[in-house]
């Protein structure tokens, strides 16, 4: 990480001008955010479907397996998709840094929609035996590969497009879309379950009903891909492309352009580790609340599948709608204080939440889920604003792809599988709570080494504002403003520019 620099003006230091500042008015921000959020909605819509159909799909895809392995075999579908995510990040991250964020986001959206719909067309184990489960895993791997670039690209895109002073607010809409997508998936499963069982009998979901939610990805995917084709490229990426001789962090040169992923890992190992720790805490809580909760409520609490789906929807919707307000709060007080609050809330609330949940009443379950949602919401609201700010523009997509996907694949996506396995082995009802608390404690340590990024331009980028008057204000106060560090901005190298003019 770069050392703290003095604000004292240095001779020949580049000066920020009004033309350098990116002015992105709200009328340009809104469609860009909308086109990005739809991808996260689609991704988590699939998680909602798969999570709430896990028990049903056990009967469809695991015939012939020992009973104690059937549920774990379907839950392994979660894990296998996440194990592939780092590969998607390693391939799509550098590609996004090279060809642009918008192009990669278009491709990931198309892959995700097609693979989700194809799951709904798979033959069952009754038709082709174990090959049904193999094909399911293959399609989950395609999903994992695409989402390996999707979230890293989406957070990078939103962070680079959002004004510096409101990055937390606009970034929170990305994860609002995620959890609304999950709630939508849960709602579709609940409605489909009720309709099919009511009109076609108790086995209707296993016979054909499970396919319907996956096939709804076809119209949703068409809309999402269309919206992705209409989003512009980010100003930060375009500025980085326009300035091939840019000088950023001279004394801590970013070697990504020369060394690729090896350079990102070698030079940015500290923000990578910080990102991995924070993402692990965020996603163990997030996936426990979403992907694992349907299984826990059915298998451990004894709720009917439709009730297990329905009871989490209001919690997810309310939490989702509050995320922009948490993001706005982080713009005022900073990302680190909000993250610290999330860590403390996790350590205090998680065990009582699972103890209350195991009393078994619907009221108790709602209270317990609300308690789990508090730290989860505090964590996820900051992901799109805090995590991309750890890395400079030239390697932001790659850095996000590595840190986010490694952490999610090892600690987030495996949460349902690992917690269910530990629960079966120990019989301890609070195992999920202890698992979540462990990773939050690690995140608390990582926060000690994290640099505050609220209100500041992204590393390797010029400031981004909403109005011309803000740009004028920043230029006027650039020497006094503690949030402006000219050494991290992509000014042209005067020597190289002069040499190019001489050779022209």
Swiss-Prot record:
GO terms for molecular function: symporter activity. It is a multi-pass membrane protein. One of its GO terms (cellular component) is plasma membrane. The chain crosses the membrane at residues 41-61, 71-91, 118-138, 169-189, 207-227, 272-292, 309-329, 337-357, 362-382, 399-419, 430-450. It is found in: Cell membrane. GO terms for biological process: amino acid transport. Pfam families: Sugar_tr. SUPFAM superfamilies: MFS general substrate transporter. Uptake is activated by osmotic stress. Inhibited by CCCP. Keywords: Amino-acid transport, Cell membrane, Membrane, Stress response, Symport, Transmembrane, Transmembrane helix, Transport. Induction: Induced upon hyperosmotic conditions, resulting in an increase of its transport activity. Its main location: membrane. InterPro entries: H+-coupled_symporters, MFS_dom, MFS_sugar_transport-like, MFS_trans_sf, Sugar_transporter_CS. Residues 477-504 are annotated as: Disordered. Belongs to the major facilitator superfamily. Involved in the uptake of osmoprotectants. Can transport ectoine and proline. Protons are probably the coupling ions. This is Ectoine/proline transporter ProP.
